[in-house]
């Protein structure tokens, strides 16, 4: 009995110690190298909401008669192929698509992306036309204290016309935003993933994927394209 009581006491002490450590880690200050200071609680809790998914989808397909929503879950084989193409692994297995249609004809596909900026994820939508090119990019929610300029048209118009086979290199193909380099890299990665997802899930099954931009076709992953290799 005494041994049991001691075991319970020790286990309880360890559990409390773990919870205290976890709570401390959750509340630990975050250092910003560019600001050269710790982020304030207000900055860490910042969340600027600009658009709902439905509002963003309407901006993607302003002339469509109908916009429908479809959640697609990747098979393990599809996920593996897409990760190989973009050059990085991601945890998601399902993606939320909005499909614009006019008189039964598809005007394009748009999907919601959540990728980490500097400290927190940002939520945005990438639209892709039937030719496999970026139509538009719209930021729905931005959670960083700096860098919200990525939602401005003067920045995200740079993605328009990009295909899965175009490099998206910062300061070469995409002009960077001072103080928001990580957000720019994150959005560029999300745009590339969106293009590959649309091609693999929609264009190739329709027999269109292999015919798009064959002259620019490359087997390079995203990181190689990003760095210009």
Regions found by a protein language model. Give the residues of each.
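Flexible, solvent-exposed loop/hinge segments and secondary-structure transition points
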Residues: 26-177, 181-185, 189-229
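Bacterial N-terminal signal peptides that target proteins for export
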Residues: 1-10
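Bacterial N-terminal signal peptides
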Residues: 9-20
């Amino acid at each position: 009995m005494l041994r049991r009581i001691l075991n319970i006491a020790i286990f309880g002490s360890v559990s409390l110690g773990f919870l205290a450590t976890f709570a401390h880690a959750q509340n630990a200050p975050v250092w910003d190298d560019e600001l050269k200071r710790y982020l304030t609680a207000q900055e860490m809790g910042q969340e600027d909401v600009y658009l709902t998914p439905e509002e963003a989808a309407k901006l993607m397909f302003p002339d469509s008669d109908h916009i429908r929503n479809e959640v697609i879950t990747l098979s393990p084989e599809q996920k593996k192929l897409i990760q190989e193409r973009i050059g990085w692994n991601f945890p998601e297995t399902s993606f939320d698509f909005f499909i614009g249609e006019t008189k039964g004809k598809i005007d394009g596909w748009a999907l919601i992306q959540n990728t980490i900026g500097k400290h927190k994820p940002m939520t945005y939508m990438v639209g892709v036309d039937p030719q496999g090119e970026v139509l538009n990019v719209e930021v729905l929610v931005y959670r960083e204290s700096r860098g919200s300029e990525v939602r401005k048209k003067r920045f995200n118009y740079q993605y328009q016309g990009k295909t899965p086979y175009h490099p998206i290199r910062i300061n070469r193909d995409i002009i960077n935003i001072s103080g928001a380099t990580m957000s720019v890299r994150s959005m560029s990665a999300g745009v590339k993933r969106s293009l590959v997802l649309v091609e693999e899930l929609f264009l190739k099954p329709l027999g269109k994927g292999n015919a798009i931009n064959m002259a620019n076709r490359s087997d390079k992953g995203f990181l190689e394209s990003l760095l210009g290799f």
